[in-house]
Amino acid sequence: MVQTRSCDYCGDDIEPGTGTMFVHNDGSTVHFCSAKCEKNADLGREPRDVEWTDEEEVEETQ
């Protein structure tokens, strides 16, 4: 059975065979669905401050 993963930045589903998995030196992994998410994470932007992420949508509804 193929596992689907979710993007650790924006929360979108990642299709099998796509996306990027980044492994830190301590062994922890981070999954990104696109280069857009990866670059925003590298720039240090918080997902709750970016309009197009799931975390931002949750804050707006509350």
UniProtKB/Swiss-Prot annotation:
Chain segments annotated as coiled-coil in the UniProt record: none
Classification via Gene3D superfamilies: Ribosomal protein L24e
Cofactor entry: Zn(2+)
Residues that coordinate or bind Zn(2+): C7, C10, C33, C37
One Pfam family it belongs to: Ribosomal_L24e
SMART domains on file: TRASH (SM00746)
Protein's name in the database: Large ribosomal subunit protein eL24
Native organism: Halobacterium salinarum (strain ATCC 700922 / JCM 11081 / NRC-1) (Halobacterium halobium)
Lineage start: Archaea, Methanobacteriati, Methanobacteriota, Stenosarchaea group, Halobacteria
